[in-house]
Regions:
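Conserved catalytic-loop aspartate of Hanks-type protein kinases
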Residues: 128
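Short, conserved alpha-helix in the C-lobe of eukaryotic-like protein kinase catalytic domains
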Residues: 131-141
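AlphaC helix of the protein kinase catalytic domain
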Residues: 32-42
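Conserved short submotifs of the Hanks-type protein kinase catalytic core
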Residues: 18-32
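Activation-segment/catalytic-loop signature of the eukaryotic protein kinase fold
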Residues: 14
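Conserved activation segment of eukaryotic-like protein kinases, specifically the C-terminal portion
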Residues: 102-116
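Catalytic-loop of the protein kinase fold
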Residues: 62-80
Length: 175
């Protein structure tokens, strides 16, 4: 709620109700990437520009002390107005806790969540990089990585982003 980051709409309030916490964010009159993907895939350049903007947003989150890990990067949680992306839905975001062996709660969206989000290890900024790699693939193909192969530089970048072992991934979004 305290962050002022371009690409993250302001959070007006966080309210507790019978279902848990409800986050009230600014309304944006644009579509989610999921809605856009119902109509078409993105060109290599468009996909790159979207991923680049998300890297900038995530870099700011990951530079906080403690680091903020979104943990639910997927087309439904990203709005796009044709120029700017907006990252929403921080319901399962968490602060990184140093020296913790694994997360106590298994959360994330199937297909996009990193393997460590299913209780194997602690999530960290590389978990967001994994999800970002899946998203990059989906923007280009409209399919999850296991369903379709890419070629060229995009394939090499995405393969590194979605490595099963976090040590095999890019270690931060600046890479």
């Amino acid at each position: 709620k305290q962050l002022d980051i371009e690409g993250i709409p302001p959070i007006y309030s966080i309210e507790e109700n019978e279902d848990g916490l409800e986050i009230i964010e600014e309304y944006l009159a644009c579509q989610t990437l999921s809605d856009i993907l119902d109509e078409h895939t993105f060109s290599n350049l468009e996909a790159y520009q979207i991923i680049r903007q998300l890297c900038i947003i995530l870099d700011v989150l990951h530079q906080q002390d403690p680091q903020i890990i979104h943990r639910d990067i997927k087309p439904e949680n990203i709005f796009y107005d044709g120029k700017q992306v907006y990252l929403f839905d921080f319901d399962i975001a968490r602060n990184y806790i140093e020296n913790q062996k694994r997360d106590t709660t298994v959360l994330g969206s199937q297909g996009y969540a990193a393997p460590e989000q299913f209780g194997f290890y602690q999530t960290d900024i590389r978990s967001d990089i994994y999800s970002l790699g899946v998203l990059y693939h989906v923007l280009l193909t409209n399919k999850l990585p296991r369903d379709y192969d890419l070629q060229g530089i995009e394939k090499r970048i995405i393969d590194k982003m979605i490595a099963i072992d976090p040590q095999g991934r890019y270690q931060d979004v600046k890479e």
